Amino acid sequence: MPMATTIEVADYTNIMPITVSITVYLGVSIGIDTSTTGFTCFSRY
């Protein structure tokens, strides 16, 4: 059990930064896409 919990904690600490970085990266990419499309639509008018 101690070994399993240690591995679980290690996996959790390793996975969390990766998921956070992926979420931030996707959020920034989506934000850039929406801002650029909104800018082009706004410039058309």
Swiss-Prot record:
Organism: Bovine coronavirus (strain Ontario)
Transmembrane regions listed in the UniProt entry: none
Protein name per the record: Non-structural protein of 4.8 kDa
Family assignment from sequence similarity: Belongs to the coronaviruses ns4/ns4.8 protein family.
